[in-house]
């Protein structure tokens, strides 16, 4: 994609990538040129750079551009005006933010997520089971504050990272005659890059947590970055425009499509290797492949955020993968508290 700048500008989107005076201008008319864009915004302050993004093949405007003011205070003036119209079309100026580096998945850690625990399993059972692999520093189950019953999942912290590798290589373990799933715990920032939650509030509660955190690991930060209908420009940038309708400039957000198709079931998408229908609470039927149905909601990020829970858990969630059996008897809403194995930290 090309950027056509007005006279006296470089026309490069990278020249001022860290400039607080840079703004993203969306909703431009196809007839709007860099000159007319500059003329309009010059009333708010001196403009150092102005450009309209164009398709490299057709040379037609893509309906958006950038304006960089010499004084960042001019940005506040623009935002202070509730309505902007250029070439008989309402436009939408927003602040342009440099895209943050994507957090990397943790490959070495001492903490694991354990999901699918039976209702009668207690924290001592979990600790005792995993001690056969190595010394356990900490073990905890996540509890529902209202019912005071655990939600079927928790965390175990080992003394040695190599033990985690061994435990997760086995992946499925049997505790109290119930198959449970073990995965490396990931920092919350990895699963929910900055900005994804803020742009997801229009989605259902479970959709927010699942689609933006675990169901779309192949598309991290897909809402927070600049590619929301404007692919291929200024690769070092992310542009945030809260309240800006996604469908106005590009395809409908993938999460909304998934919601329309009903692909989320109890916070888990239906997986080809596991049964999709939800099971009634407490029924815990057998599933294809020999695994009984799980009773826990699994790793949903919102379950680890409340202030009431243990500080050692709040920054971790499990990496995404389906539990053996997608039907869960418990709902996922509701605050959680953690009960921890006493080791000097709790």
UniProtKB/Swiss-Prot annotation:
Q: Where is this region: Disordered?
A: 1-28, 276-304
Q: What induces it?
A: Up-regulated in astrocytes after brain injury.
Q: Name one GO molecular function term.
A: identical protein binding
- Compartments where found: Cytoplasm
Compositionally biased region (Polar residues)? 1-15
Which UniProt keywords are present, listed alphabetically? Acetylation, Cytoplasm, Methylation, Phosphoprotein, Repeat, RNA-binding, Ubl conjugation
- Residue numbers carrying Omega-N-methylarginine: 228, 261
Q: Which InterPro entries match?
A: MSI_RRM2, Nucleotide-bd_a/b_plait_sf, RBD_domain_sf, RRM_dom
Ribonucleoprotein is among the record's keywords: no
In the UniProt record, which is one GO cellular component term? cytosol
- Which Pfam families does the protein's record reference? RRM_1
Q: Which CDD domains match?
A: RRM1_MSI2 (cd12760), RRM2_MSI (cd12323)
Q: In which tissues is it expressed?
A: Ubiquitous. Expressed in proliferating neural precursor cells.
- Which modifications occur after translation, per UniProt? Phosphorylated. Ubiquitinated by the RHOBTB2-CUL3-RBX1 ubiquitin ligase complex.
Provide the positions where the record notes the PTM Phosphoserine: 6
Q: Where is the composition biased (Low complexity)?
A: 276-289
The segment(s) forming the RRM domain are 21-111, 110-187
Q: Whom does it interact with, and what assembly results? A: Interacts with RHOBTB2; the interaction is necessary for MSI2 ubiquitination and degradation.
Q: Which PANTHER family match?
A: RNA-BINDING PROTEIN MUSASHI HOMOLOG 2, RNA-BINDING PROTEIN MUSASHI HOMOLOG RBP6
**What is this protein for, i.e. what is its function?**
RNA binding protein that regulates the expression of target mRNAs at the translation level. May play a role in the proliferation and maintenance of stem cells in the central nervous system.
Q: Which family does it belong to?
A: Belongs to the Musashi family.
According to UniProt, the name of this protein is RNA-binding protein Musashi homolog 2
Q: What species is this protein from?
A: Mus musculus (Mouse)
